[in-house]
Regions:
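Donor nucleotide-sugar recognition loop
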Residues: 33-38, 48-66, 71-81
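Extended catalytic-interface subdomain
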Residues: 1-47, 54, 98-107, 125-138, ...
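Terminal low-complexity segments of carbohydrate-biosynthetic enzymes
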Residues: 101-303
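C-terminal, active-site-flanking charged/polar segments
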Residues: 64-73, 89, 97-102, 144-147
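Active-site donor/metal-binding and catalytic loop motifs
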Residues: 76-92
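Short hydrophobic/aromatic-rich motifs at helix boundaries and adjacent loops
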Residues: 18, 34, 74-76, 114-117
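Short, contiguous acidic/charged loop-to-helix segments that flank catalytic cores in large enzymes
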Residues: 52-56, 89-94
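Residue-level signal for well-ordered alpha-helical segments
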Residues: 22-23, 42, 79, 115-118, ...
Length: 303
C-alpha cells in the first residue's frame, strides 16, 4: 500500500539543531554533520545564493552541511548507499584535494585551528607518503597547500577538470593485478585500530628503517597496510586492491630529502601567508557559494 507524504515525514529521521537531539546513535558525535548520502535539504536552504563550494571533490559536502546544519536535514530511513571501502585504494590525486580543501574548510569554519596544527597534519601526509614509497602523494600534499595559498580568485578561475588531469600526469605507470585481492576482517580491524602504530618507537626513529641497512627481500604494501609493515625494505610491490593495479617502488634517499624540503617550505609559507589567505576566503565566501559563479564556470568550460 502506498504511504502518504505525511506518513513518510513522520517516519523519517529529522535532525534539526544538535541541542534538542536525543537519538542515541548520534550521542557519541561532537558535532552533527553528514555527506550528501541518504539525506535531504529543504529547498529553502538550497538557494542560488547558498550552493556548495566549487571544490571538484572532497569536503564540499561536509562544508555545506556545517554551513547549514542549524536549518536541519532529513535522513531517509531505509535508503542505503553501497560504496567501495575507502581503505582499499591508495590516495593518489586525492592527497591534493585532502590538503587543499581541508585548508579552505579551516579558513572558513575553524578559526581556532593554529598554523602549527596545520603544519603537523600536512607534514604527516607528506612523511607517510614517503614511508609508503608513494612519492607522488608527498608532492600532491605539498601542492595542495601551495594552491590553497593562491587564494579564492585562483580557485574561481581554475578549470577543475583540466587541473585534475594535470595532477594525474604525475601518477606512475601501473599494470593490472593477476589475482583479485580483498582485505580480510582481521586486516580491516587492524586498519581502523587507532593503536595500530603504537609500540613502533624503533621503526619511527629510524624512519621505518631508511637509516638502517636495507632488507633486499621484496615487500608488499596494500592501501590498508600500515607503512611499518615494510620496515627496512629496499623494494616493494604496491598493490592497489580497489583499482586492481600494481607497481614496483624503490627506496630513494633523495625522496627523503625532498620530503624534508616540502615540510620546511610548508612551515615557512603557513607562518607568513596563511593569515592573508584566510581573510581572502572569508571576504569572497558569499561569491564562492553563489550560483552565478557556477554558471560562469559552466559557460567557460563549454567555451
Amino acid at each position: 500500500m502506498r504511504q502518504t507524504f505525511e506518513h513518510f515525514l513522520n517516519t523519517a529521521t529529522v535532525m534539526k539543531s544538535p541541542k534538542p537531539l536525543s537519538i542515541s546513535i548520534f550521542d557519541y558525535l561532537k558535532r552533527f554533520d553528514s555527506g550528501w548520502w541518504c539525506c535531504c535539504y529543504s529547498l529553502n536552504t538550497v538557494r542560488k545564493d547558498n550552493l556548495p563550494l566549487p571544490l571538484f571533490i572532497h569536503r564540499d559536502d561536509i562544508e555545506y552541511e556545517i554551513r547549514n546544519r542549524e536549518t536541519g536535514i532529513v535522513f531517509l530511513n531505509g535508503f542505503n548507499v553501497w560504496h567501495k571501502g575507502f581503505e582499499v585504494n591508495f590516495l593518489g590525486t586525492n592527497a591534493y584535494y585532502d590538503v587543499r580543501n581541508n585548508l579552505i574548510f579551516a579558513a572558513l569554519h575553524e578559526p581556532d585551528m593554529s598554523r602549527i596544527q596545520m603544519w603537523k597534519w600536512i607534514s604527516k601526509f607528506i612523511i607517510t607518503a614517503v614511508l609508503k614509497m608513494r612519492y607522488e602523494e608527498a608532492y600532491f600534499s605539498w601542492r595542495g597547500m601551495i594552491d590553497f595559498m593562491k587564494g579564492p580568485e585562483w580557485l574561481m578561475g581554475t578549470d577543475a577538470e583540466r587541473l585534475n588531469n594535470q595532477l594525474r600526469k604525475h601518477l606512475p605507470d601501473t599494470e593490472p593485478m593477476e589475482l583479485e585481492e580483498q582485505p580480510t576482517l582481521k586486516e580491516l580491524q587492524r586498519c581502523y585500530n587507532p593503536d595500530r602504530n603504537k609500540k613502533q618507537f624503533w621503526k619511527k626513529i629510524t624512519f621505518n628503517g631508511w637509516f638502517l641497512p636495507a632488507d633486499k627481500e621484496v615487500g608488499i604494501l596494500r592501501p590498508y597496510d600500515a607503512p611499518f609493515s615494510i620496515f627496512r625494505k629496499k623494494r616493494i610491490e604496491l598493490r592497489d586492491t580497489g583499482a586492481k593495479k600494481k607497481r614496483v617502488a624503490v627506496r630513494e634517499e633523495r625522496q627523503l630529502f625532498k620530503a624534508a624540503m616540502y615540510c620546511i617550505n610548508t612551515w615557512r609559507i603557513l607562518m607568513v601567508q596563511y593569515g592573508k589567505t584566510q581573510k581572502e576566503y572569508k571576504t569572497k565566501y558569499e561569491i564562492l557559494k553563489n550560483g552565478k559563479l557556477w554558471i560562469e564556470k559552466i559557460l567557460t568550460n563549454r567555451g
